Amino acid sequence: MSAKTEILRNIREALGTRAPDTPIEREYRQAPALTQADRITLFTDRLQDYNATVYRTASVPEAIAEALRARVKRGLLIPPAFPPQWLPAGFDFTRDDGLTYDVIDHSEGALTACTAAIALTGTIILSHSAHEGRRALTLIPDYHLCIVRVDQLADTVPEGIRALAGCRTSPITTISGPSATADIEMIRVKGVHGPRTLDVIILEDVIIWEEP
């Protein structure tokens, strides 16, 4: 028996019978009470702080077309099960059905959905479902256009993590703005660990799809 254990035992014996534990009431607020409008505004502000461009819309095809025209892009790579009704006419979209890394690297970028997003930190979470694509699709290209539905938007990090309850065996990627890093001399470089440019479409109409 260690000296610490013996000392604590002697203290407990000296105190006599231990009183029953008293439960602590947890009536304090554990998360911000945001309205949906406040949540969207906070998420948008955080993304813009990260130099991401945000589009709020009820029409995904129109927002995608607007983003591609603004970036002067002719088309993007998309995950295998990306909803076809979201794709605007007049652009070239290539489904990733096993594209080589070289093809992905030389593409104009990727268009994906997401699993969840966190308003407080401006973070997008990917679990790489068939609507989001494999990790290479959102790490190799220089441009990422991501769609976030309002019903996927959580207030805080714990709430966002709870949205991953069914994704315990999936690889998880968290995105807080375009990729950037700094060395010991604080020289900031973009695009080292992922896309240099991030655009986000916030879909204000809730659309539920089924996993293939």
Segments predicted by a language model, with ranges:
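The feature marks the mature, well-folded catalytic cores of soluble enzymes
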Residues: 1-212
